[in-house]
Amino acid sequence: MANLHQQQIIDKIQNITFKDGTFLNEVISDIIIKGNNIGFSIDISGKNKLEAEEIRLKAINKLNNIKEVNKITIVFTQSKTIDKKAQKPKHFVENVKKIILVASGKGGVGKSTISALIAQQLSLENYRVGIVDADIYGPSIPHIFGINGIPKTVEGRIVPILAQNIQIISIGFFVKAHSAIIYRGPMASKIIYQLLSNTRWNNLDYLIIDMPPGTGDIHLSIIENYHLDGVIVVTTQQKISEIDVIRSIDLYRKLGLPILGIIENMIYMLESDHCGYLSKKYHIPLIAQIPIMPQIANACDKSLPLTNLLTLPLEKYL
């Protein structure tokens, strides 16, 4: 008879999730294997106990399909909760109702284009919308909207530039074109604070934040310091893109930020096994699949509205 090993257990329960999107594999520990008997603990901190019991039974049913297993023991544990009084209070952005991040672990997947499209579409639907270009090292929003000016200041606060009826702020407004932007992490985080909190937003329904690639200081600074309503994840069909996006998904789940959906950008015309893969694997809604369209790049280069080319089913997800 073959020996049991931990990977068998993990593989069997990998698709079991809580209603909040947490995968069971993320909250189990202390896996013990003794002969044909197995056991582990589930951290149910912040979970509904009835739901946790349902999850436990699902896990037992899955594990009973391993022929070598004789006895299964699953216990519940709870990690120490953080004293809310000791938690750092999060900031609300003045005159902003909702803040949505547009993110991806990979650069070059079209986050800025998607951010612009979302903002333009919401504006056409009569919402008051703003964009923060949080890609400090590679700001693209000024180019997409054809903005060359420098924002004014009123009473020490930045007035966002209005383009296509959208209020926009970007570090790109304050540096020379094609100049390298060189900031260490703490300085980049301070700039983000200035762009978010020191801008005179005019009664926004939605503030879209075009995030930089990766999962670094800027991401942590925004997520840990501001009240956010969710994140839209952008990816492509390429495997290398998916690998980085998975890291982003892991970050947002660990930090408790709702993932509103996935947008697959620059989809090939041919069928691919990767279409919808992340949405299915991580149980995240697939908002849209956008094909490769030269017209989109042309519209961005000419600062034309992207809504002339396509729209997204945003009402279902925002």
UniProtKB/Swiss-Prot annotation:
Gene Ontology process terms (BP): iron-sulfur cluster assembly
Sequence positions that bind ATP: 105-112
Family, as annotated: Belongs to the Mrp/NBP35 ATP-binding proteins family.
Name this protein carries in UniProt: Iron-sulfur cluster carrier protein
Disulfide bonds: none
Membrane-spanning residues: none
Keyword field contains Protein biosynthesis: no
Coiled-coil region(s): none
Domain of life: Bacteria
Molecular function via GO: 4 iron, 4 sulfur cluster binding; ATP binding; ATP hydrolysis activity; ATP-dependent FeS chaperone activity; metal ion binding
Keyword Hydrolase: yes
InterPro entries xrefs: Mrp-like_CS, Mrp/NBP35_ATP-bd, NUBPL-like, P-loop_NTPase, YlxH/NBP35
Alphabetical UniProt keywords: ATP-binding, Hydrolase, Iron, Iron-sulfur, Metal-binding, Nucleotide-binding
PANTHER family reported for this sequence: IRON-SULFUR PROTEIN NUBPL
Subunit structure: Homodimer.
Gene giving rise to this polypeptide: mrp
Function: Binds and transfers iron-sulfur (Fe-S) clusters to target apoproteins. Can hydrolyze ATP.
